[in-house]
UniProtKB/Swiss-Prot annotation:
This is Protein LSM12 homolog B. It comes from Danio rerio (Zebrafish). Disulfide bonds: none annotated. Transmembrane segments: none annotated. GO terms for molecular function: RNA binding. InterPro entries: AD, Lsm12-like, LSM12_ABD, LSM12_LSM, Sm. Belongs to the LSM12 family. PANTHER family: LSM12 HOMOLOG (PTHR13542). It comes from the Eukaryota. Residues 3-70 form the Sm domain. Residues 81-175 form the AD domain.
């Protein structure tokens, strides 16, 4: 069965088995089914092997050669979980502020390094904003270009010390990533030369 015909659908909670066009056998519980797009969402056993997790697979039935219903839904599916709209609104507002902040930095001509440092600080300290090309943290610490530890200015105290530690760690991590990339490139070049 390639796809259900008109009026046919999969019940949420049913267990099905599908054979994809790539020969992969998928088996799981139906979480959702959209008839117009022929998309089936299955909750499958976890590929990680962790028992408290599940893999969620989206299956386009146009690319399935066979679908078997193993067990039909035995009872009424549980009601959908309620959504915390305040939490969703706050998350959307925070995402919007983050995107606007990034757009401001780009339009102000802030260097990529400055943008990356801002994002690193913002992960730890949400009270972080741009003032022209300067990063302002907790309204106490100003980091000006070129955004090094020596460019952190503010009242001596725990806030300045904490921000300096974040900046130091950020640049250590960046240096570490660069050295790993260089060693990988050198290894790749060496491997290419040996295979020639």
């Amino acid at each position: 069965m390639a796809a259900p015909g008109p009026g046919e659908y999969f019940s949420v909670g049913s267990h099905v088995s599908c054979l994809t066009c790539l020969g992969q056998r998928l088996q799981g519980e139906v979480v959702a089914f959209d008839y117009p797009s022929k998309m089936l969402t299955l909750k499958c056993a976890p590929s990680s092997g962790k028992p408290n997790l599940s893999d969620v697979m989206l299956v386009n039935l146009a690319y399935v050669s066979e679908v078997d219903i193993i067990t039909d839904r035995a009872e009424t599916p549980p009601p959908l979980a309620s959504l915390n709209f305040n939490k969703l609104v706050n998350r959307a507002r925070a995402e919007k502020e983050d995107k606007l902040s990034l757009a401001y930095a780009v339009s102000a001509g802030v260097s990529v390094e400055g943008q990356q440092l801002f994002q690193t600080i913002h992960k730890t300290i949400k009270e972080c904003k741009w003032q022209e090309k300067n990063i302002i943290v907790m309204d106490d610490v100003v980091i000006s270009p070129p955004y090094q530890v020596d460019n952190c200015k503010g009242k001596e105290g725990s806030a300045l010390s904490h921000v300096r530690k974040i900046v130091e760690k950020h640049f250590r991590d960046v240096e570490s990533q660069i050295s790993v990339q260089h060693s990988q490139q050198a290894q790749h070049t060496q491997d290419s030369a040996l295979s020639s």
